[in-house]
Amino acid sequence: MADILLLDNIDSFTWNLADQLRTNGHNVVIYRNHIPAQTLIDRLATMKNPVLMLSPGPGVPSEAGCMPELLTRLRGKLPIIGICLGHQAIVEAYGGYVGQAGEILHGKASSIEHDGQAMFAGLANPLPVARYHSLVGSNVPAGLTINAHFNGMVMAVRHDADRVCGFQFHPESILTTQGARLLEQTLAWAQQKLEPTNTLQPILEKLYQAQTLTQQESHQLFSAVVRGELKPEQLAAALVSMKIRGEHPNEIAGAATALLENAAPFPRPEYLFADIVGTGGDGSNSINISTASAFVAAACGLKVAKHGNRSVSSKSGSSDLLAAFGINLDMNADKSRQALDELGVCFLFAPKYHTGLRHAMPVRQQLKTRTLFNVLGPLINPAHPPLALIGVYSPELVLPIAETLRVLGYQRAAVVHSGGMDEVSLHAPTIVAELHDGEIKSYQLTAEDFGLTPYHQDQLAGGTPEENRDILTRLLQGKGDAAHEAAVAANVAMLMRLHGQEDLKANAQTVLDVLRNGTAYDRVTALAARG
């Protein structure tokens, strides 16, 4: 018998579900999703065999009251079962995407195929189920097992270690012919005690033998890192082993999905938006080109959710510059999303969303060398943008990072390096690996491709955050140096291409026109005014 806290996402199916569970002898208490998350966490703490169940409901997961916060705080600590909207929330919480299913289903019977494992053991296959949904989960991260599907759509997921699972369909419906049995087997699975095993040691041994990890193994390793479960000497050995051999795209993707799953949630928009970001570490100490480009892109009508951190190797990282502009780095997720909606730009401060990285910081500081963590920053944007322009500090990283973006499910992205800089530049050819609908194309770009004049790298030199603020203030007000204008124009033009505007020369001219009318600076002051 389970003690179930059923979170009601304001849906009549909640009561059908409660009746089914109570018929089978389970204790069920129901709370609506407008109750503070802490109140529900305190209530769960009083239960003997607690299970959190997330009901169906209208709308999208990010708007379902306290549900996203509950998932962030409780996954891995107690069993969680999600149904329909609850299932979608689980997919999002672990780093997946929820979007339109292509049709609106209301009481439709479908026969899904499943893996016959765990909660589906012994059930009919295909299994008739009831579907009531217009959204569906996709880009499911490696940490979740897809254990049921219908015509390529995800119908169920589970996380064995965390004892978290979700069903896109309704097991409590009469149209789900074996729904009662499925619920019982799910609760039995959820309450099983995992035998403690040292599952990380075989993974570490593979690294010591210079073998490449699978995406799942890398995911497992870095999940342990962000939970603080790895000893410093183990983490140091793992990072150095991968560095010497060279990190594989599947290893980078596994680490990225682990960090995304453990990140604080951000209400992901359904409209098209992008990130423009560099790894840093190129040693150029240039002005903050990608940060300036984000504001200019917004003034050009694009939407940019920029993920960034303080400086590691330069005098001024993106967050250092933003702080100098008076922009609040601790802006909460809802306010940041509102800024993205209304201004076309927001900034997500990495330490606010990825608190688990604190466990790796002492080791990184002691090693004093680049490791896999140096390339993870651009890949772990908690907003999960479908588009990205990513600069890398080494030409050897261009193709591997593009391959990683493909594994992570990006819709379209470009990875670039140019003459020692982690962005598109005009002083040297820009090496590009462009991902578009699963295909990667490699090519080079020069200043001529943008219709711009080449400039020397020295003309992009920056300084302290305050010095860079003053430089970019002039630039965004339409009073900047020609070299600075051209650098931003090239990068925003490339970002516009990722949005389907293929003509780089026309794009660059549009950017220059916007730069010179000063409207980009209005985005800076408006964002700073939001506090």
From Swiss-Prot:
Molecular function GO terms recorded: anthranilate phosphoribosyltransferase activity; anthranilate synthase activity; magnesium ion binding
Residues covered by region (Anthranilate phosphoribosyltransferase): 202-531
Reported regulation of activity: Cooperatively feedback inhibited by tryptophan.
Pathway stated in the Swiss-Prot or TrEMBL entry: Amino-acid biosynthesis; L-tryptophan biosynthesis; L-tryptophan from chorismate: step 1/5; Amino-acid biosynthesis; L-tryptophan biosynthesis; L-tryptophan from chorismate: step 2/5
Binding site for L-glutamine: G57, P58, G59, Q88, S134, L135
Alphabetized InterPro entries for the sequence: Anthranilate_Pribosyl_Tfrase, Class_I_gatase-like, GATASE, Glycosyl_Trfase_fam3, Glycosyl_Trfase_fam3_N_dom, Glycosyl_Trfase_fam3_N_dom_sf, Nuc_phospho_transferase, TrpG/PapA_dom
UniProt keywords, alphabetically: Allosteric enzyme, Amino-acid biosynthesis, Aromatic amino acid biosynthesis, Glutamine amidotransferase, Glycosyltransferase, Lyase, Multifunctional enzyme, Transferase, Tryptophan biosynthesis
Entry EC no(s): 4.1.3.27, 2.4.2.18
Glutamine amidotransferase type-1 domain boundaries: 3-196
Active site: C84 (nucleophile), H170 (for gatase activity), E172 (for gatase activity)
GO annotation terms (biological process): L-tryptophan biosynthetic process; phenazine biosynthetic process
Subunit field text: Monomer. Heterotetramer consisting of two non-identical subunits: a beta subunit (TrpG) and a large alpha subunit (TrpE).
PANTHER family: ANTHRANILATE PHOSPHORIBOSYLTRANSFERASE (PTHR43285:SF2)
Function: Part of a heterotetrameric complex that catalyzes the two-step biosynthesis of anthranilate, an intermediate in the biosynthesis of L-tryptophan. In the first step, the glutamine-binding beta subunit (TrpG) of anthranilate synthase (AS) provides the glutamine amidotransferase activity which generates ammonia as a substrate that, along with chorismate, is used in the second step, catalyzed by the large alpha subunit of AS (TrpE) to produce anthranilate. In the absence of TrpG, TrpE can synthesize anthranilate directly from chorismate and high concentrations of ammonia.
The family this protein is said to belong to: In the C-terminal section; belongs to the anthranilate phosphoribosyltransferase family.
The protein's name in its UniProt record: Bifunctional protein TrpGD
Name of the gene encoding the protein in the UniProt record: trpGD
